[in-house]
Amino acid sequence: LNGITICDEFFYSLIGENKYYGTPINLNAHGCVPGGSSSGSAAALTTDLYDFSIGSDTGGSVRIPASFCGLIGMRPTHNRINTKGVYPMAPSFDTVGWFANSVVIFQKVGEVLLDKMDKSDINFRQFVIAEDLLELCDAAVQENFNNYIKNNLPGIDKNRLSNISKDIIADNFRILQ
């Protein structure tokens, strides 16, 4: 089954407009843009004619249209879903994500796309934690996070960094833009 939708020009914007083919209509927010760049994939679901759609995500291209269109959307970790056949924009960031209106459908699509993964497949040796950002979370969230790391990442160096300023995060995000 193949489907084609419209994305913004060169899949490079986060608002989803396409001046050449028309901006996909966001029926969940009349008069508002659908978000981009996978705008057509998200807007198609606002018609209630489809159960789910797929989009590519490099720097927000599934998550942003999901938010703008009132959908459930996800960008899984890089290389978690095969990108064969996906036109690359930034191969070291590109991944495939999906949208749905229903949590049940969203989960079913996820079960198909994200086949079961054994924890032994995890092959990284280092995990970096931004302490000052973690401190912004509620105490219960911090405790759950630390317990998860302790119980699920044994034998992995856990470097704890502090003073990760918002400016550093913003500067690194600019690279994606």
List PLM regions with ranges.
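Short glycine/serine-rich loop/turn segments
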Residues: 1-93
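Short charge-dense sequence patches
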Residues: 23, 53-63, 92-103, 135-137, ...
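A sequence-composition feature that detects small, non-aromatic residues
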Residues: 29, 42-44, 66, 90, ...
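Catalytic-loop motifs flanking and including active-site residues across diverse enzymes
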Residues: 37-41, 105, 141
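Hydrophobic transmembrane alpha-helix bundles
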Residues: 38-50, 91-101, 154-169
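Predominant activation on well-ordered alpha-helical scaffold segments within soluble catalytic domains
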Residues: 42-46, 75, 104-111, 146
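A short core secondary-structure module
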Residues: 78-130, 135-137
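Amidase signature
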Residues: 115-177
